[in-house]
Amino acid sequence: MSSRKFGLNLVVVLAIAALFTGFWALINRPVFAPAWPEQISGFSYSPFRLGESPQKGQYPTDEELRQDLEQLSKLTDSIRIYTVEGTQADIPRLAEEFGLRVTLGIWISPDQERNEREIATAIQLANTSRSVVRVVVGNEALFREEVTPENLIKYLDRVRAAVKVPVTTSEQWHIWKEHPELARHVDLIAAHILPYWEFVPMKDSVEFVLDRARELKHQFPRKPLLLSEVGWPSNGRMRGGADATQADQAIYLRTLVNTLNRRGYNYFVIEAYDQPWKASDEGSVGAYWGVYNAERQQKFNFDGPVVAIPQWRALAVASVVLAMIALMVLFIDGSALRQRGRTFLTFITFLCGSVLVWIAYDYSQQYSTWFSLTVGVLLALGALGVFIVLLTEAHELAEAVWIHKRRREFLPVQADSAYRPKVSVHVPCYNEPPEMVKQTLDALAALDYPDYEVLVIDNNTKDPAVWEPLKAHCEKLGERFKFFHVAPLAGFKGGALNYLIPHTAKDAEVIAVIDSDYCVDRNWLKHMVPHFADPKIAVVQSPQDYRDQHESAFKKLCYSEYKGFFHIGMVTRNDRDAIIQHGTMTMTRRSVLEELGWAEWCICEDAELGLRVFEKGLSAAYAHNSYGKGLMPDTFIDFKKQRFRWAYGAIQIIKHHAGALLRGKGSQLTRGQRYHFLAGWLPWIADGMNIFFTIGALLWSAAMIIVPHRVDPPLMIFAIPPLALFFFKVGKIVFLYRRAVGVNLKDAFAAALAGLALSHTIAKAVLYGFFTSSMPFFRTPKNADSHGLLVAISEAREELFIMVLLWGAALGIYLVQGLPSSDMRFWVAMLLVQSLPYVAALVMAFLSSLPKPQEKAAEPQQA
């Protein structure tokens, strides 16, 4: 690399690094808020630490309680507790040691026996402990509909009669307005005003609290007002404009407590310490209302500017380091990239690095159980995998569009003096329409080449009416053509091709293979065989192409999808001598083929042979020009079966050649070849892994519908990577097809639609490939009739089933929970986007059911 190019690259990398660092700084701009006062009115205090939970009967020790009370006594002289169950009954006694006043809580629930125990204990404590200054009978018991107003009033009257301190119940502010009769049975109004739960943005929340307080004072002028819960969570899902972040918690609380102090309100900040156990009752946000975390560490600064992520500088550095590592890998052997391609890759890499660091940081702020930790690790690994796939996709895009010139171009050789040895063309067929195969043989007979033979093998076709016409046609075409009918013959297509090798003419130096539906250009051998003059070349490959794209809308979409595979992926792979050998329009040096043979164990014997050629240190040549056109599948089920075979075969090859591909063990594969074989099939593997994401999304959505108050939508950060990959892949297809293939926008979207329709099929093939060792060879039928609509839809029944599940999950969440928050809307949108490949499959199935023009013409006319 020249010093000028290196300098330019360095400037670009530094500029983009500065851009993303600037973005980290932008979203972490300091915001000023009043300093925390020396004393606040009070804290709501639940004493549980990590690993402790009242639901499991796990209570803190007296020593732990003392540590908490000592810490809180430095900020307030008043605490509120919610129950006297377990060791919480010791809090009034211990609070006396630190001069703390206690608002004692009695937890009222549908459990009558527990209610009686709570009331008895609370009365005893209120009458014997100097620290108890008031008693609260029930906490949001009416709001939860766990007690009737009449029964709550009975409890209130009983406790008021039994104690000397003021008695009240604590409810959300609107419950007091709905049940004003409660005021006659309490000594003060204790109201919760929590703007977060009411979708109020943080910036409007202080005024919201003051307005509600004024309303209550106006409605109950003779009763003292206690704001028994005011607060803001530091983590959790958004509710409308209310965002649960540490920065918003800090700004809101620092502003609110100063305002309430100035105006003389009595209040309790909910809460002193984070309570992870509450997540099971209130959703994930329930764990994060503390001013201190569960380890008793202060969560935000009490003075000075508030920064959203105090550690943002370290995170920015980490994202830059991560991006630089990935970039160094992507730029290996990248000298052919133009500057625009390098800039594009640099930007995408820094974007991925920043998002990955953000995901890791955000998840690190969660309280984890073994279950959530396991899920989080799996999701994190999934996110890492998604970004690896995204980077490989971006790398392919850059090398397809922004490159100075192709490194290895194999143009047609037209010179008469060129090297043109004898060629043996092998045509395998099984149960193929005779008239179609005759067209293939006629095209071979018209080849403009001095010395070649054609060997046709029909293996295992049972009906003589199918193979005997081919035998007769070969005899008619002359001595160049030889026909073999062999039954039984094991090994599918690979077995048939292996059978022909010893029957090949002794003086043939090249063996060519075409499928039985391909009509070749007369110049195919003349233009391409001369490339074997290079002794290192073992394979010469021409792209697959098709001639029936105008027969139907279905085939037009299939044709658009095929073009990218053969005119984008193979072209970029050819630059590093890493093409995937196709089973048609391919030529192999005879000596190499005799040594290696076709792998009968592999369902994609062609691609497997090509890899073994590379492992021997030999090369392949790929031509851009089309020299033959075949027929595409006629139905969606056949289209799926063909792609299933390709994807299943890819996994077979990866498993069988893992040592060579992953470590280069026992082979002469270059790093570029290993990269392309792994990276090229990585998107298919990602499709396979996406099945697990879809299953997980459906299970999680079901939980959100069944227990909506306990299960929140997953963290948005984990839904972003698969969505980003989906839209990037679709955008990449559209962009590449327009730039590299030269098709119009309509055909580019057609390619994207056809590709999406195969996602489920590929996913199944990948999973079958990893968990099975072999499957039968799927022959792609030719000249098949279209199926009816119901048959076509039944061929996509799995896709239809999953689509209905995803749509049902989205609808169920909407009906049960609504769309109150951005993360809820995002999750529902994610479910709908996840359904798009399945919708595409149904569209393709429908199009394949439409009659082809010749079928329409054959229909009887109505009188």
Q: Whereabouts are the PLM-identified features?
A:
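Aromatic-rich peripheral "rim/lid" segments of glycoside hydrolase catalytic domains that contact
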Residues: 34-37, 48-50, 54-57, 238-246, ...
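Aromatic- and acid-rich polysaccharide-binding/catalytic face
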Residues: 104, 133, 171-212, 230-233
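Membrane-embedded multi-pass helical conduit in multi-pass membrane proteins
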Residues: 335-388, 415, 683-776, 792-863
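Cell-envelope/extracellular polymer assembly enzymes that use nucleotide-activated donors
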Residues: 422-424, 453, 608
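Short, acidic, metal-binding catalytic loop of nucleotide-sugar glycosyltransferases
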Residues: 441-451
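A conserved acidic beta->alpha catalytic loop
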Residues: 450, 458-470, 487-490
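Long helical/loop segments within the catalytic core of UDP-sugar-dependent glycosyltransferases
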Residues: 472-509, 522-603, 608, 612-615, ...
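The conserved acidic donor/metal-binding loop of glycosyltransferases
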Residues: 514-519
